[in-house]
């Protein structure tokens, strides 16, 4: 986080942080602005995804991990991102994230999910899955 200040933890890494997946992250998934250079950090396997605005800046939370402030996407934004990048991470991961979000969140915010789906332009993709879990 200190070496890459514009990066935001996303996808599988964010799902794992929020407890929304059974997947074990083997890399740290980072969102960077379009056309940013790929950072190199020794000993840390990174997987970079390029985001454009407004998707990059939407839904960011700041959490403290080991005394360091880390930018990470909210659970709702992460679920929408999983559907956007379903061809890279797998549709099964996206569906599992949505189902787990609904089951483990005391008050699921489906309006926020719909907002982030619209920002990511995946409303049509997510709609049948949202209807199935409601």
Positions of PLM-derived features:
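Nucleic-acid-binding surface
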Residues: 1-134
């Amino acid at each position: 986080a200190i070496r890459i200040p514009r990066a935001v933890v996303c996808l599988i890494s964010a799902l794992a942080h929020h407890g929304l997946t059974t997947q074990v992250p083997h890399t740290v998934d980072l969102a960077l602005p379009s056309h940013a250079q790929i950072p190199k950090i020794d000993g840390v396997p990174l997987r970079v995804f390029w985001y454009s605005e407004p998707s990059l800046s939407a839904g960011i939370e700041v959490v403290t991990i080991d005394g360091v402030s880390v930018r990470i996407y909210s659970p709702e934004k992460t679920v929408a991102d999983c559907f956007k990048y379903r061809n890279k991470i797998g549709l099964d991961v996206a569906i599992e994230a949505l189902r787990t979000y609904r089951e483990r969140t005391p008050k699921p915010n489906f309006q926020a999910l719909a907002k982030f789906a619209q920002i990511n332009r995946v409303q049509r993709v997510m709609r049948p899955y949202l209807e199935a879990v409601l």
